[in-house]
Structures are given as structure tokens and as C-alpha cells.
Amino acid sequence: MTTAPETSGNWIDEHHNGVRYGLEGRVLVEETSPFQRITVIDSQRYGKGLLLDGCWMTAEHQERHYHEALVHPALCSAKAIERVLVIGGGDGGTARECLRYPGVKHLDMVEIDGRVVDLSQEHLPSIGGGCWHDPRFHLTIGDGIAWAAEAENAFYDVVLVDGSDPTGPAEGLFNRAFFSNCCRILKPGGVFATQSESPEAFRQVHIDMVKLIRELFGHADPLYGWVPMYPSGWWSWTFAAKDAPRYLTVQSERAAAVAEGSAIWSPRWQQGAFNTIPAFIERELNQ
């Protein structure tokens, strides 16, 4: 289990199953919203960062490892990208990356906790960048689970889930009913993607998620990458589609438009990241 961030001297630590992950720095904000405990820190190594209920979420100088991995395999492969849904993502990083594509005409972001948005805009403005003022961006402070349940069939070209760990307000982002609705509201030729935890620190959660998403969508595969401040540093994102594993192949014109401005993602990186699945994970997924 993960416990509250612990400060010892100048260190802010996240504890998880006998292991701790820490950054040297200082706490800027510590408050409890109606949904969760929110901590904003200023670290020496990664700049300002955000924790929710004691879990590291993002930081200025390493957030691209996460946001680029979630967004670009989906946006570079979906048949169309005019209408995008982001569930969660209150720091703005996922929306920022999506809005780099001129083909995105309308982006809905549904974040349950308005204080995450407020504090991210105040303390972490570089992560959201200009997304907050983009006319294509539409923010709703509300329940993303309910939004997915109430949305029309085949309404979105891309659905991205940028949620926290499966506890507290994000717990419902990991179950059959939610993923079924995400599948239902995805257009033909669309791509779904979600962060799917660490195959080391959250091994069973990761395996169960990939299996369930594959069952519901028909095609799903995990992509593996590195997020330095997350438990074990080894993280995953799972991509799914209903017609074919289209997320494995990028559309070259879209890729060329965003690759130069990306710090982590490239078509070559993506190909390698999909192919780094460890044998023990592949065996368990195929059981």
C-alpha cells in the first residue's frame, strides 16, 4: 500500500510495500480537497511536482516521460482525431500534448477535482502550457466515470484516461463497467489509451487491466517506459482498438508534425516501447 508522503529533513518520500521513493525539496502546499490530499512540492532534481494522496503524479522536469507516452501512440494512429476525450489529467499535460495536433478540433477534459486544476495552473503552469486558453479545449469539473456512462455511442475518435492509482476517486477508472463505456463511446477506427500502472510495483493490477481491456475491445497491448519518480520507475500504458491493433503503426504525416517538438516520443521509440514486454508478463497475459 501507499502511505502519506513523509518528510524527513529536506526529503519528501512516497512509501509503497516496503520501498520508498523520494525527492529532496520542500513542501509548498498541503491541503485536503473533498476528494483527496493534494501536495505541491519544489524539488531540487525535477522542479515543482504534484502528489495526490501521497502518490507522485507529475513534476516539471520529467512529466514528458508520461504525457508523451500516453498521447502520441494514440493520436498518431487513430483513423481520425477530431474529437478527443481526456478523463482525469488535471495538470493539463495530456491536453497540452493532444492540442499540438491541428487535426484535433474539440477536446473534452473531465477532471473530478477542481483544486488539482487550480493548483496546477498556479504552481505548475509549464505542464499545461497554453492548453487552458486553447479554443478547442473544454474543461468540465466532474466525474469522468459518469461522463463516459452518459456519452453517446461512437462519439469520440480518441479516449485517453489519465488517472491516478486505483484508490480514492480514481478507483472506478479500473473496472469493467468503465472500460465497457469507453469502448462503447469510441468511434470505429478510434484508439483508447490509459495509464496501466507498473508491471513491477503493481504487477497484478497491470496484468488484470491489460487482460480486461483486451477482452472488451478485441485488440490491446501494453507499452512500457520510464517515469523516474514513479514506484520502481518502470511504467506502462495500454492501448486498445476495436477494429485492429492500429496503435502499433503511426501515420507518418501526423508523426512528423509532432516528433521534432517531443522530448521522449518518436516513431522509433514507440516501436521499441511496444516490443519491450518482458517474457513473464507476456506469459501471464496469454494464460
Curated annotation (Swiss-Prot):
Localization, UniProt: Cytoplasm
Active site: D162
Annotated pathway: Amine and polyamine biosynthesis; spermidine biosynthesis; spermidine from putrescine: step 1/1
EC number: 2.5.1.16
N-terminal signal peptide: none
Class in the EC hierarchy, top level: transferase
Cross-referenced Pfam families: Spermine_synt_N, Spermine_synth
Record InterPro entries: PABS, PABS_CS, SAM-dependent_MTases_sf, Spermi_synthase, Spermidine_synt_N, Spermidine_synt_N_sf
Catalysed reactions listed for this entry: S-adenosyl 3-(methylsulfanyl)propylamine + putrescine = S-methyl-5'-thioadenosine + spermidine + H(+)
Keywords tagged on the record: Cytoplasm, Polyamine biosynthesis, Spermidine biosynthesis, Transferase
Disulfide links within the chain: none
GO terms, molecular function: spermidine synthase activity
PABS domain ranges (all copies): 9-242
The keyword Transferase is assigned to this record: yes
Membership in a protein family: Belongs to the spermidine/spermine synthase family.
Name listed for the protein in its UniProt record: Polyamine aminopropyltransferase
Source organism: Synechococcus sp. (strain CC9311)
Gene name as annotated: speE
